[in-house]
Curated annotation (Swiss-Prot):
Domain of life (superkingdom): Bacteria
Gene it is expressed from: moaC
Alphabetical keyword list: Lyase, Molybdenum cofactor biosynthesis
Function: Catalyzes the conversion of (8S)-3',8-cyclo-7,8-dihydroguanosine 5'-triphosphate to cyclic pyranopterin monophosphate (cPMP).
This protein's record includes keyword Nucleotidyltransferase: no
Record: active site: 128
Positions with a binding annotation for substrate: 75-77, 113-114
Gene3D superfamilies hit by this protein: Molybdopterin cofactor biosynthesis C (MoaC) domain
The name this protein goes by in its record: Cyclic pyranopterin monophosphate synthase
First and last residue of the signal peptide: none
Entry keyword Lyase: yes
EC number: 4.6.1.17
Pathway of action: Cofactor biosynthesis; molybdopterin biosynthesis
Reactions that this protein is recorded to catalyse: (8S)-3',8-cyclo-7,8-dihydroguanosine 5'-triphosphate = cyclic pyranopterin phosphate + diphosphate
Length: 158
């Protein structure tokens, strides 16, 4: 099993030194889902939520989440992101909203945390905007789907 990189020899947390790593194109894709009542889904689909355009605001929140990851996750490096693409899919069969985020940079460390944070913040925004009508919404299945670039190469979830 690989070693955990965020701990020194004494077991103390530290920020990993990426200064000696080569700069490469880094891409990560993450996704997640928020399940809800059918009536809540319809409010979102029709654009009738009292707080406004749920998907539009959640998209901006997800982008902001990716950009602010280093402020939220203590040992993440602040990164100059070159792209954050956020897609929402409305799924009336569940009913749910699926969020998929692709984050890119050209740098020395990956962007998996930025993609995961973006998905979570986007879905949390959906919850915030709809909680008055559905406190039982559930955020689920948040995970990295793929990553590309860096020393460890490409990885795609099964």
């Amino acid at each position: 099993m690989p070693e955990l990189t965020h701990f020194d020899a004494a077991g103390q947390a530290h920020m990993v030194d990426v200064g000696g790593k080569a700069e490469t194109k880094r891409i990560a894709v993450a996704r997640g889902t928020i399940r809800m009542l059918p009536a809540t889904f319809e409010l979102i689909r029709k654009g009738e939520a009292k707080k406004g355009d749920v998907i539009g605001i959640a998209r901006i929140a997800a982008i902001q989440g990716a950009k602010r990851t280093a402020d939220l996750i203590p040992l993440c490096h602040p990164l100059a992101l070159t792209r954050v693409a956020v897609d929402f899919e409305l799924d009336e069969t569940v009913p749910a909203v699926h969020c998929r985020v692709q984050v890119e940079t050209h740098g020395r460390t990956g962007v998996e945390m930025e993609a995961l944070t973006a998905v979570q913040v986007g879905l949390l925004t959906v919850y915030d905007m709809c909680k008055a009508v559905d406190r039982g919404m559930t955020i689920t299945d948040v995970k990295v789907m793929e990553k590309h670039g860096g020393k460890s190469g490409d990885w795609v979830a099964e």
